Amino acid sequence: MELLLGREAFLRLAEALDEPARVAFRPNDGKGFRVAGTLAAVPWSSYGHYLNERPAFTFDPLFHQGAYYVQEPSSMFVEQALRVCGLPRKVLDLCAAPGGKSTLIRSCLPPESLLVSNEPVKLRAQVLVENMLKWGHPATVVTNNYPADFGVALPGCFDVIAVDAPCSGEGMFRKDNPALEEWSTDNVMACASRQRSIVKDVWPALAEGGFLIYSTCTYNVEENERNVMWICRELGAELVKLPVDAAWNITGSLCSELSGPVYRFLPHLTEGEGFFLALLRKTVPVSQGNRRTKPVVLPKLKEPALSWLASRPEGWRLWQSGDQQWAIDGALAASVGQLLSALKVLSAGVELAMVKGRKLQPLQGLALSHCCCADAFPRVAVEGEEALAYLRRLSLTLPPSVPRGYVLLTWQGQPLGFVNNLGAHANNLYPQNWRIRSGYTTTIDNKFIERVG
């Protein structure tokens, strides 16, 4: 980095890395939340704001309700790239876990656009499912596939593909010591090679004229500028300029071989971690390939589950995977059916219910969805200790006046999750793998977000 930046700038960068990282978050406007107070805004994001300190988010029920997402501020610049892409109908976030960029992309997209959030590593994909379900938007699919699966089965399918490529992690040295310990020039070159393979494999799935948002959280030119040059030269693409305010202090190319628009975030100049982004437009036709799959036809959703959801102009369709049911917006049924036939889909639309004999048990995704019908279930408001007990998946006792059966608990007016009230006690239906494992018993006093209205 000293060779790239010069001695003085390098020393300023090193000094900045000794300072604590800034904490930022985005409220979920889809659920009616906004920033409270006068927190400093992340200048390149319509949604992001800085916090003055890092609270214990784990003990804030609103965090588990998907009221906001904690995200590294530099990476929120993806919003600027996406806004140049027009109104895409289908977007793929290829390396999406844990979900920060996907939840941001989802907030920026028109409601009718379909977002596919993918993660090839199974355990990380489960975390992605959790975070996307908490965000609550129904036009979202989560998959567990490799890049080539998209390139082979879905040629020209996507208008935008975001690749936040696995990298050497130089931009995370401040907060991630393992990244520093694992760094080597050999690892940098291996990462650069893997990144090219990832982009090459998924490239056929991008429509002609479509956009690739390529990003990393590292500094070196091999994984950044030189990979961008390779994509343009070998795959057929051109760089696209983004509207950038000079006051943001974003740095351009550090490689003399590339003069086109790329965007670097350096911690001594911007309040965030190291980040690189380039927006590229595909300039070559799509090869349709040979593989064809017949889309899955989704039947109409019926009662009683239909009454659990707010109405849609084209109704709701049903996808059942084993004993688990999902509700798909009828307007997206054909697109989701195509994905179901070609990919390993982990979640799609609204996580609705589990089949229990002849009955349906409502699931957590329904409680946290934008589309959960407000009067479909009896509601009971809980206080701080009860909310944390629920999130720890402990048994609860409800007031005698509460009817038996499925009850939706709320915290600060926002759905928290379901219980099955048996009278003497209520069975906790919170997902086992989502539960709070810490025994700490306090809730944080969240004063940085509020409900609109």
What are the language-model segments listed below?
Residues 1-36, 273, 283-453:
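Polybasic, low-complexity RNA-engagement segments
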Residues 123, 159-201, 213, 217-225, ...:
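Mobile active-site "lid"/loop adjacent to the S-adenosyl-L-methionine
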Residues 118-156:
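S-adenosyl-L-methionine
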Residues 110, 206-208:
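Helix-to-beta-strand junctions that scaffold the AdoMet/dcAdoMet cofactor pocket
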Residues 98-111:
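Conserved SAM-binding loop of SAM-dependent methyltransferases across substrates and taxa
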Residues 88-97:
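Conserved class I S-adenosyl-L-methionine
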Residues 86, 151-164:
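A short acidic, Gly/Pro-enriched loop at the edge of an enzyme's catalytic core
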Residues 158, 211-214, 218-327, 331:
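Class I S-adenosyl-L-methionine
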